[in-house]
A protein has these predicted regions:
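Short, hydrophobic alpha-helix immediately C-terminal to the catalytic nucleophile
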Residues: 92, 116-117
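Gly/Ala-rich beta-loop-alpha elbow adjacent to hydrolase catalytic centers
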Residues: 107-115
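Alpha/beta-hydrolase active-site loop
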Residues: 81-98
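N-terminal cap/lid segment of alpha/beta-hydrolase-fold proteins
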Residues: 2-30
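Short beta-strand element of the alpha/beta-hydrolase
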Residues: 32-40
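Conserved alpha/beta-hydrolase
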Residues: 54-76
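The serine-hydrolase catalytic nucleophile loop
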Residues: 41-54
Length: 117
């Protein structure tokens, strides 16, 4: 299970639009593709689906990266300020900062929509 002290932080946006995004990253075996998990609306990276994806990644030697969108879980910001555009910007920033290997993007519900954007 996820612990708050395990989460890394990344700042996305500038000025008043800046927000701190919580990220969990677990490295995998060299040569294996990784997984980026994108949660659904009002879900976070500690949810059942996110934990199952992380467990699958561990047992198959894959890296796994997951985040809490702003206003969700361990990330900063108010939920009411969230938009699909902001949450997409956060997902892209996390992908660019953390996903070093070829990566499969997996999303649930709203996270699936964001994965397609």
């Amino acid at each position: 299970m996820m612990q708050q002290d395990q989460a890394q932080r990344i700042t996305v946006g500038t000025g008043e639009a800046a927000r701190e995004i919580a990220v969990l990253r677990e490295d995998g075996a060299p040569g294996r593709c990784g997984i980026l998990w994108l949660s659904g609306f009002k879900s976070d990276m500690a949810g059942t689906k996110a934990e199952e994806i992380a467990a699958f990644a561990r047992t198959t030697g894959r890296a796994v990266t997951r985040l809490d969108y702003s206003g969700h879980g361990l990330s900063g910001g108010d939920f009411e300020d969230g938009t699909i555009s902001r949450w997409t910007e956060e997902a892209v920033a996390v992908f660019e900062a953390f996903c070093r290997e070829p990566t499969i993007v997996v999303g649930s519900s709203m996270g699936g929509w964001i994965a397609l954007l």
